UniProtKB/Swiss-Prot annotation:
Zn(2+) 1 binds at residues 14, 16, 100, 248. This is Dihydroorotase. Catalyzes the reversible cyclization of carbamoyl aspartate to dihydroorotate. Belongs to the metallo-dependent hydrolases superfamily. DHOase family. Class II DHOase subfamily. Its EC number is 3.5.2.3. It comes from Ruegeria pomeroyi (strain ATCC 700808 / DSM 15171 / DSS-3).
Length: 346
């Protein structure tokens, strides 16, 4: 039985760092284990220009504790007013790594997102020309569509037409939550990848709802049925390089999560790798963990893998802190619901 596993240092291909006191609180939790992360641009106001991306990157680097080695990979928030020239300049210079598409109203701070996809077609065409990837929050927001069906409908109504109209565009389906999403990636070998979160590999909607509502498991896209979770585990542990880790670790003050109308997001960064080792061990696929966390993402983005390594060791259950101080507030750490025996030891 494997008791120790050394892998290339991982990257997180979907991360929320926030800003200000929250940024200062959560950044070390990612930088401790991850070398790079795709940083989400849905601040208030959102990061919509190259200048704003540069300023946000500078704030992140200024906040990074001394001695920690971490590279934020910046993104732009796509709007119907996005300037293709500004976007192209930011990407060509290496300032941004990708562009994020939020359908308006789909998730936290997405009000500035896209309503009319025809209005962003010229931008998408420019992105295809310059090789800038598009990260997609894949849900429709029509009120008549059930929240549990929004991903599948998005694939049919929005994503597939976008990809057919812009065949050179490289697309990342972020935080896929359904068998539909996993199957769509599997059926489209060129220019399409997908990130998968910790919570969607560990839990289904019963874990969130049965016996009482657990707000710290509430995220968007929402947890789905068990067979969808099983399909995600199969995809993540398959060794297929089109699937890679994007934690979507999304911190909110505890009072905003434990509220009558609670915020969406799970703060998984402190224990993400321990959770993943548990999932992959349960699936008999520890040998595939390095690909999912450390190799597949760089391959899709055309970036080098990290030179350094980390070691995960199996021992007595990990002592998981319940909360993390964040300025005047606290952030509740994701509860895995089971003892975690794997931890990063070096």
């Amino acid at each position: 039985m494997t008791q120790s596993l050394t892998i290339r240092r991982p990257d997180d291909w979907h991360l929320h760092l926030r800003d200000g006191a929250m940024l200062a609180a959560v950044l070390p939790e990612t930088a401790r284990h991850f070398a790079r992360a795709i940083v989400m641009p849905n601040l208030v106001p959102p990061v919509v220009t190259g200048a704003q991306a540069a300023a946000y990157r500078d704030r992140i680097l200024a906040t990074l504790p001394k001695g920690m080695n971490f590279e934020p990979l910046m993104t732009l928030y796509l709007t119907e007013q996005t300037d293709p020239d500004d976007l192209a300049a930011a990407h060509t210079s290496g300032l941004i790594t990708s562009v994020k598409l939020y359908p308006a109203g789909a998730t936290t701070n997405s009000a500035s997102g896209v309503k009319d996809f025809d209005k962003v077609r010229p931008v998408l065409e420019r992105m295809a020309e310059i090789g800038c990837p598009l990260c997609v929050h894949g849900e429709v927001t029509d009120r008549e569509i059930d929240i549990f069906d929004r991903e599948a409908v998005f694939i049919d109504r929005v994503l597939d037409p976008i990809r057919r109209a812009t065949p050179g565009l490289r697309v990342i389906m972020e935080h896929i939550t359904t068998k539909d999403g996993a199957d769509y990636v599997a059926a489209n070998p060129e220019g399409l990848g997908a990130t998968i979160t910790v919570q969607h590999l560990m839990f289904d909607r019963n874990d969130m709802l049965v016996g009482g509502m657990r707000p710290h498991y509430y995220c968007l896209p929402i947890l789905k049925r068990r067979h969808h979770r099983e399909a995600l585990v199969a995809a993540a542990t398959s060794g297929d390089a089109r699937y890679f880790l994007g934690t979507d670790s999304a911190p909110h003050p505890t009072h905003a999560k434990e509220a009558e109308c609670c915020a969406a997001g799970c703060f998984t960064a402190p224990i993400a790798l321990s959770c993943l080792a548990h999932v992959f061990e349960e699936a008999g696929a520890l040998d595939k963990l390095e690909g999912f966390t450390s190799l597949n993402g760089p391959a899709f983005y055309g970036l080098p893998v990290n030179a350094d390594t980390i070691t995960l060791s199996k021992a007595d259950p990990l002592d998981i802190p319940k909360t993390l101080p964040a300025g005047e507030h606290t952030v509740t750490v994701f509860d895995p619901g089971v003892p975690l025996h794997w931890r990063v030891t070096r």
